């Protein structure tokens, strides 16, 4: 009997860590939703003048609705939700490196898994057996995400904003086709690490379609006017904005195809105005944070930030494309304008295809 008791005790002790490892579930959309999502890279091209270390493709902004629940870790402890980049290190392409831009920060899918805090905290399911008053009497406020026993969340739903990208780690030869197919770039899981069980209910985001990449023997150059790449709205008062409604400045981007003896490929380009700042009006306005907002116009139509659209076609005889834009500054609805200098950064990005 002593041997049997000892054996059973050992089994229980070794089983406990496994139970904790399976503690957190995360789904696409609502609780019980899908746990697999795939982004297929649309066909795109690498210009001949691309540089090692440069991003050669980016997705549009991807806004993923994530719901996490089932925190049953021991000790009634809360759990932080993490986005794990490169959760399953595996064979990679010799020329291309995958990555994720999460909340404006780049994470390469190389080496060991890289945990990114989503700033979402999940209260323990088991703590709900106690009333808020009982939790206070036990001094367990520190086991509640908010520190308030009246504000317990055993389910969290949030929107993860990310972009997928491909970076060059070595210049591929003309005509190269990648053999890398499906790759998991992100998994939503607990702070403790990646749940690799086959039946894990942890949302995984896949990327595939690297075989759609074409290596060009041509490229293009860009010239931005004004040449300092700064748009200066000058000095003005809040009253000026109220009276005039908007202040406008123009700028332009000229793109020239590099046509040399080696260039035999035609190609197209998509462009995007990219920002990490807060957006409004269906992502057509950047909120500067001082009561003002910025739009970029094509004629009178506003561009949607962080979304790619067709920009230039060099499949024919055309060698140059010049596009004029208007930067429009106006008052943010319902906000008072704060005086003082300000700046915001918007990047012009290109995908070849």
Model-derived features: positions:
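Charged, low-complexity surface segments at secondary-structure and domain boundaries
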Residues: 10-11, 25
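C-terminal segment of classical bacterial N-terminal signal peptides
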Residues: 13-20
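Intrinsically disordered, low-complexity serine/threonine-rich segments
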Residues: 9-10, 328
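Mature extracellular/passenger domains of Gram-negative fimbrial/pilin and adhesin proteins
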Residues: 22-353
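Bacterial N-terminal signal peptides that target proteins for export
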Residues: 1-8
